[in-house]
């Protein structure tokens, strides 16, 4: 497999999160159209970096309705979201593995048993025994570093 390649790095205020999420949503949809496969977006950053907040913005940019709450699945490990229509129509999984035991097997989560997902958004992927098992076709990593009222977003892409 190829190493991750830096696509871009931006530091923005929290008010610009929608713009960042929109740009990444466009990239994910272009990938899905080109490959007919799901994407897997890894979110990395410390506690409070804004991973779940970003996930909500990304799902909204993909077309999730404002009335549907996007919450952290810290205790349930996975939340599912359905976008009923549009270019991004389909099911999406948001995983938060922070409380998982180190070395968790992806099969234990039942991610691939639940339904065919158009995309997977994964917080704390390093908790998996085989992190690559959640990325059969594509990985996007975003490293977010807290910096007061702004965040630094570094997008890395791996295509294989």
Predicted regions and their residues:
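Short phosphate-coordinating micro-motif centered on Lys-Gly-acidic
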Residues: 1-3, 102-160
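P-loop (Walker A) phosphate-binding loop of NTP-binding proteins
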Residues: 44-46
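Conserved lysine of the Walker
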Residues: 51
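Phosphate-binding P-loop
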Residues: 27-38
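Charged, amphipathic alpha-helical linker segments immediately N-terminal to NTP-binding catalytic cores
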Residues: 1-19
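Short beta-strand-centered segment that lines the nucleotide-binding/catalytic pocket of NTP-utilizing
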Residues: 64-81
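Short hydrophobic/aromatic beta-strand immediately N-terminal to the Walker A/P-loop
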Residues: 40-42
């Amino acid at each position: 497999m190829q190493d991750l390649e830096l696509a871009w790095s931006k530091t923005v205020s929290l008010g610009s999160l929608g713009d960042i999420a929109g740009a990444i949503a466009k990239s994910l949809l272009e990938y899905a159209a080109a490959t007919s496969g799901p994407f897997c977006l890894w979110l990395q950053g410390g506690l409070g970096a804004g991973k779940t907040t970003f996930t909500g913005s990304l799902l909204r940019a993909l077309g999730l309705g404002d009335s549907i709450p996007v919450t952290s699945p810290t205790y349930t490990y996975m939340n599912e979201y359905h976008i009923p229509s549009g270019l991004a129509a389909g099911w999406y999984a948001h995983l938060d593995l922070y409380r998982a035991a180190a070395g968790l097997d992806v099969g234990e989560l039942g991610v691939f048993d639940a339904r065919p997902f158009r995309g997977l958004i994964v917080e704390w992927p390093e908790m998996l025994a085989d992190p690559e098992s959640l990325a059969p076709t594509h990985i996007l990593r975003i490293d977010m570093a807290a910096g007061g009222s702004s965040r630094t977003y570094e997008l890395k892409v791996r295509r294989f």
